[in-house]
UniProtKB/Swiss-Prot annotation:
Keyword match NAD: no
Complexes and interactors: Homodimer.
Protein name (record): Phosphomethylpyrimidine synthase
Domain of life of the native organism: Bacteria
Annotated residues for binding of Zn(2+): 430, 494
The keyword Transmembrane appears for this protein: no
One Pfam family from the record: ThiC_Rad_SAM
Keywords for the protein's UniProt record, in alphabetical order: 4Fe-4S, Iron, Iron-sulfur, Lyase, Metal-binding, S-adenosyl-L-methionine, Thiamine biosynthesis, Zinc
């Protein structure tokens, strides 16, 4: 530890990122209660102004939006990152009666870190003893689902996905929605707890929720649900502190990150992860091979199954919800990458390829896969089967190495399911638009509809600094075709470690892609927010336009750059066209004129009817005697 690190006592000094706890404008946190009082599902309600009298003068119902920010945006909750978040799930877990509280950490590395006095000032102070399944028990959500049990977690996500659709229909918010094209997905008009159970039992969806992460607000990943996004954080050997990583977490979930992966490769990985999990209301994923490599000082050849197994247990006992495991990088696939333009670009994939070549043995993650499953089901950690041979350039897309690994991931998925372990599949990468559908179709075929989770894909390689856009295009497409979760890409992709602004930009880009996919699939209620914003735009309700957007702050700032006065917030024009050329204003004038013409036409028509009736009453004679 450096002198500076020794001087910092995080258990005393750590503070929440103040930007992350600011309430959203005209929004309030609401909770929808389930069948029991401790199932309280958070949503964000956006209040809207009334329609101006010029436009008919009606009240506008508030709009509910999916909320990933946890208690950080609830003004009634006092946030203290030194203590972590409140417990959400322990009562549900205890009631099932199939877990036990351990006397302490069971991983060798976890015990070493706990006994290192020098780390005391960096350590999260309120570490619980971990839980584990009782001997012979399986505590995965898939296992419960296959037993016909609807867990509290399943009910929770059903309420969360449904977003009070019945009330929205009653309020007329669903009167306008285009029919979607879902490419064979089976999206019901209403998400019920039983439907959630069926999808998890079938393997088409997962609820990543480790029994040692009781702070998590359950969410679901699957093609028949809302498309989710993941945001990456994590330190590197070149910098970033524990407090900065927690700030990235809280900042990311504020803007809509459904899950977060901690990809730390620098110092204090164990301690950083503890702080992140204890303060995270969303599932946390990791790539355990990264930390295992740090334990052997970066020498891939020195990795062993025993060391990796201890790392899995260490992280499972901390509460990691899903592991990326690169078990599909087989020895026979490595030569297939030799003629690629960019070779093996996955860090985990390259580590395992190097180990295989150095020992001329099969990947130990593959040969010990059943043993990994035993660990996963003891803590309910979900698999995210890593695509270690994903293409790193569009030239390498859809090649033999990529699809060979995908077929192996399909085999491993079926092994995981035999153990009732939840599983999703990671995908590319760099893929031109015309090859994206083939990726999705191949994954559905090989992996029997297990959820697909892709990094983009990037659709072109010519835009360093703008890869959030090149990948957002591919993300929207593959989300429409059936991908369940999209891993965000920031503007810093290929260039450097993202800062807070980059994280926000990446998340907003991917929220757009995910929402566009939901619209295209015809997800029930997906168009409510679009309709509300479009109506606000036509009626010049500027504040409602800002507040209904994914990023109210940026929308307001852009508007105020040219029209900063408060009077501009009620003006019937913006700086794009000015007062005389605003299409919305002209359209309203056309409507008013048409209404007047219609009124005149009605008067004329009424007069004509009266004259016709008089004509008939007078005998229907064309001429009358004088």
């Amino acid at each position: 530890m450096t002198k500076q690190e020794k001087a910092i006592n995080l258990s005393e000094s750590a503070q929440v990122d103040q930007q992350s706890v600011q309430p959203f404008p005209r929004s309030r946190k609401v909770y929808v209660e389930g069948s029991r009082p401790d199932i309280r599902v958070p949503m964000r309600e956006i209040s809207l102004d009334d329609t101006p009298t010029d436009f008919g003068g009606e009240s506008n119902a508030p709009v509910l939006v999916y909320d990933t920010s946890g208690p950080y945006t609830d003004p009634d909750v006092i946030i203290d990152v030194r203590k972590g978040l409140a417990d959400v799930r322990s009562a549900w877990i205890e009631a099932r009666g199939d877990t036990e509280r351990l006397e302490g950490l069971s991983s060798d590395f976890g015990q070493q870190r706990l006994n290192d006095a020098e780390l005391a000032k960096l350590r999260f102070a309120h570490v619980r003893n971990p839980r584990r399944a009782k001997a012979g028990a399986n505590v995965s959500q898939m296992h419960y689902a296959r037993q016909g049990i609807i867990t509290a977690e399943m009910e929770y996500v059903a309420i969360r996905e449904n977003m009070k659709l019945q009330e929205a229909r009653a309020a007329g918010l669903l009167n306008e929605q285009h029919a979607g094209h879902s490419f064979g997905a089976n999206i019901p008009k209403e998400i019920t707890p039983e439907f959630v159970r069926q999808e998890i039992a079938r393997g088409r969806a997962i609820i990543p929720a480790n029994i040692n992460h009781p702070e998590v607000e359950p969410m679901i990943i699957g093609r028949n649900f809302l498309v989710k996004i993941n945001g990456n954080i994590g330190n590197s050997a070149l910098g970033s502190s524990i407090e900065e990583e927690v700030a990235k977490l809280t900042w990311g979930i504020r803007w809509g990150s459904d899950t977060v992966m901690d990809l730390s490769t620098g110092k204090h990985i164990h301690e950083t992860r503890e702080w992140i999990i204890r303060n995270s209301p969303v599932p946390i994923g990791t790539v355990p091979i990264y930390q295992a490599l740090e334990k052997v000082n970066g020498v891939a050849e020195d990795l062993t199954w025993e060391l990796f197994r201890d790392t899995l247990i260490e992280q499972a006992e901390q509460g990691v919800d899903y592991f990326t495991i690169h078990a599909g990088v087989l020895l026979r696939y490595v030569p297939l990458t030799a003629k690629r333009v960019t070779g093996i670009v996955s860090r985990g994939g390259s580590i395992m390829a190097k180990w295989c070549l150095a020992h001329h043995k099969e990947n130990f993650l593959y040969t010990h896969f059943d043993e990994i499953c035993e660990i996963m089901k003891a803590y309910d950690v979900s698999f995210s089967l890593g695509d270690g041979l994903r293409p790193g350039s569009i030239a390498d897309a859809n090649d033999a190495a990529q699809f060979g690994e995908l077929e192996t991931l399909g085999e491993l998925t079926k092994i995981a399911w035999k153990h009732d372990v939840q599983c999703m599949i990671e995908g590319p990468g760099h893929v031109p638009m015309q090859l994206i559908k083939e990726n999705m179709d191949k994954q559905l075929e090989c992996c029997d509809e297990a959820p697909f989770y892709t990094l983009g894909p990037l659709t072109t390689d010519i835009a360093p600094g703008y890869d959030h856009i090149t990948s957002g295009i591919g993300a929207a497409m593959i989300g429409w075709f059936g991908c369940a979760m999209l891993c965000y890409v920031t503007p810093k992709e290929h260039l450097g470690l993202p800062n807070k602004d980059d994280v926000k930009t990446g998340i907003i880009t991917y929220k757009i892609a995910a929402h566009a996919a939901d619209l295209a699939k015809g997800h029930p209620g997906a168009q409510i927010r679009d309709n509300a914003l479009s109506k606000a735009r036509f009626e010049f309700r500027w504040e409602d336009q800002f507040n209904l957007g994914l990023d109210p702050d940026t929308a307001r700032a852009f508007h105020d750059e040219t029209l900063p006065k408060e009077s501009a917030k009620v003006a019937h024009f913006c700086s794009m066209c000015g007062p005389k050329f605003c299409s919305m204003k002209i359209t309203q004038e056309v409507r008013e004129y048409a209404a007047k013409i219609e009124a005149v036409d009605v008067t004329v028509e009424q007069g004509m009817r009266e004259q016709a009736e008089r004509f008939r009453q007078e005998g229907s004679q064309l001429y009358h005697k004088v």
